[in-house]
């Protein structure tokens, strides 16, 4: 069975197609990613998740490598699939769509990303209407007040402090990315939920958006000549053969770092929680379940809530930092001085 959501060209095309509404100015992004399935037999083996598999998880895990073992069940919960599962009520298959050789199927992660986008639309729509009804001398309350604090935090502590002049034009993207990632992270912690940010194709697509925004912003701020001059870092022409490859590699390591950071942190958290739960099944001990699995799982679960906010903040902060570094004239001059 497949152990990871591998990077696939078809998946990246699918994600890009589904997130185009964000670039066209809609109120919230719709991101998508899913595992491109291999042979039908292998896929069915990975997708099987029944009451029997749950009940015998400890016995299979004890065997070490049997189908339905603890490791297989854990990976099954983390990986994407073409079905929504609501144990013990059953499994509901999702439609498969293939266009021009590209798999654009609706998957579990796609459904939860649509749900996150819907939540964003409803919340921001409600807050927007709330502000329309508030008089100039009145203070907002409830959700509107909380959202105002969030917007001010992103504006002052993230966008303005890292981008500087012209930060306003990047606020919609940064605010949307923060809330979108946060909602996705939290949806992965609810019962029957799925963590789309644990899919490397999703985090890669988000990072690619940051990459292109960074490069376009840098070209607009410095011009083509200034942008290309950055690649040489003000060094003597004899060193260009060394500096240019280093600078080009540096351009791509930034989105790579964003991709792996978010993907690894969210995936690791879910693996730890599920592993702690399965300790009691593997050891077949109620004592372990009461004094180890349950309390430690609750602790990690609460920690994951904090990590959900933290990772959304880090991704947004680094995105703003990369945009600011690419747009700042003085940043290039400082590099040239070195």
From Swiss-Prot:
Entry protein name: ATP synthase subunit a
Lineage: Bacteria, Pseudomonadati, Chlorobiota, Chlorobiia, Chlorobiales
Subunit structure: F-type ATPases have 2 components, CF(1) - the catalytic core - and CF(0) - the membrane proton channel. CF(1) has five subunits: alpha(3), beta(3), gamma(1), delta(1), epsilon(1). CF(0) has four main subunits: a, b, b' and c.
CDD domains (alphabetical): ATP-synt_Fo_a_6
SUPFAM superfamilies tied to this protein: F1F0 ATP synthase subunit A
One Pfam family from the record: ATP-synt_A
Comp. bias (Basic and acidic residues): 49-65
Gene3D superfamilies with a match to the protein in the record: ATP synthase, F0 complex, subunit A
InterPro entries xrefs: ATP_synth_F0_asu, ATP_synth_F0_asu_AS, ATP_synth_F0_asu_bact/mt, F0_ATP_A_sf
Topology of this chain in the membrane: Multi-pass membrane protein
Organism: Chlorobium phaeobacteroides (strain BS1)
Family to which this protein belongs: Belongs to the ATPase A chain family.
């Amino acid at each position: 069975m497949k152990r990871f959501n591998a990077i696939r060209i078809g998946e990246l095309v699918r994600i890009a197609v589904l997130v185009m509404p964000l670039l066209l100015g809609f109120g919230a992004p719709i991101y998508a990613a899913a595992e491109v399935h291999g042979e039908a037999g292998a896929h069915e083996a990975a997708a099987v998740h029944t009451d029997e598999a749950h009940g015998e998880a400890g016995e299979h895990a004890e065997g070490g490598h049997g189908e339905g073992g603890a490791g297989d069940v854990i990976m099954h919960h983390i990986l994407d699939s073409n079905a929504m599962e609501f144990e013990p009520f059953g499994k509901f298959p999702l439609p498969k769509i293939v266009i021009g050789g590209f798999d654009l199927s609706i998957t579990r992660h796609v459904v939860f990303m649509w749900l996150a986008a819907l939540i964003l639309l409803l919340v921001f729509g409600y807050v927007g209407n709330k502000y329309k009804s508030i008089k100039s001398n009145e203070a907002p309350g409830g959700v509107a007040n909380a959202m105002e604090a969030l917007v001010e935090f992103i504006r002052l502590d993230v966008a303005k402090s890292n981008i500087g002049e012209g930060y306003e034009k990047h606020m919609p993207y940064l605010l949307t990315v923060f809330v979108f990632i946060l909602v996705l992270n939290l949806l992965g912690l609810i019962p029957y939920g799925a963590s789309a940010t644990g899919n490397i194709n999703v985090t890669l697509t988000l990072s690619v958006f940051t990459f292109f925004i960074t490069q376009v912003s840098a070209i607009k701020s410095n011009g083509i000549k200034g942008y290309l001059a950055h690649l040489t870092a003000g060094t003597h022409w004899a060193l260009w053969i060394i500096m240019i490859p280093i600078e080009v590699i540096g351009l791509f390591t930034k989105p790579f770092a964003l991709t792996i950071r978010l993907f690894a942190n969210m995936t690791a958290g879910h693996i730890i929680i599920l592993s702690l739960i399965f300790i009691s099944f593997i050891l077949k001990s109620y004592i372990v379940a009461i004094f180890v699995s349950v309390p430690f799982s609750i602790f990690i679960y609460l920690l994951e809530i904090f990590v959900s906010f933290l990772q959304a903040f880090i991704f947004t902060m680094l995105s703003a930092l990369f945009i600011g570094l690419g747009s700042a004239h003085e940043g290039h001059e400082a590099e040239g001085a070195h």
